[in-house]
Amino acid sequence: LGLLGLVGWIGDPVVFWRDLLDLLAEVSRQASGVDIEPLSWESLEPLAPIMAGIMASAVLVALSLALLLGTWWASGIHGGSFAAMFRNLHLGYVIGGLATIAGIAAILGLQPLAGNVLLVLGTGFAFQGLAVVYWWSWSKQWPRGWWLALYFPLFLGPAVRMSEMALLVTLGFIDNWYRLRPGREDMV
């Protein structure tokens, strides 16, 4: 909904982000010294069509992390188990249906809007995919420190990071429709 509001407010989002990224590239060129490579417009231009989705996803990540942190604090005060609640995270069929529609629309060429919506919904499924991994680690009693194998690749660069995020999104989406966690209680 916020993504649609942004599009309504700024008009054509591709033009808006293209102008903003062009300004960023120009500022980078002006600020660069001999030690740093300035940002090139060619590296930023492909981001313009999906920049609204990237920004909305970033806001969703920040809000989700704040919500998870607050839930963790509240569970510590009230004696609940945050880990159990997180392991049961499930977005539900409505969000799954919207993601399916956005995916079909993206395949049919309704870009960039469908791609941007898919980015935002994919962010939620990344959290659900992470919950699936934590559920597996808990149910299979993986050894301590297993999470290093999950989080270390995030520091290996953008290609590895995006591949891992795509895997988490896929895992979350599949779990949404076909329960990969038997006995899971639905918690949104």
Map each language-model feature to its residues.
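Membrane-interface interhelical loops and short interface/amphipathic helices
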Residues: 4-51
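Hydrophobic alpha-helical transmembrane segments
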Residues: 34-64, 139, 162
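Long, positively charged, glycine-interspersed low-complexity recognition regions
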Residues: 111, 118-188
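Alpha-helical transmembrane segments of multi-pass integral membrane proteins
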Residues: 1-12, 51-67, 90-103
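Aromatic-anchored segments of alpha-helical transmembrane domains
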Residues: 2-4, 98-106, 151-159, 176
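Hydrophobic, lipid-facing residues on alpha-helical transmembrane segments of integral membrane proteins
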Residues: 56-73, 121, 125-129
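Small-residue-rich helix-loop
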Residues: 79-134
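Membrane-water interface at transmembrane helix exits
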Residues: 70-78, 134, 138
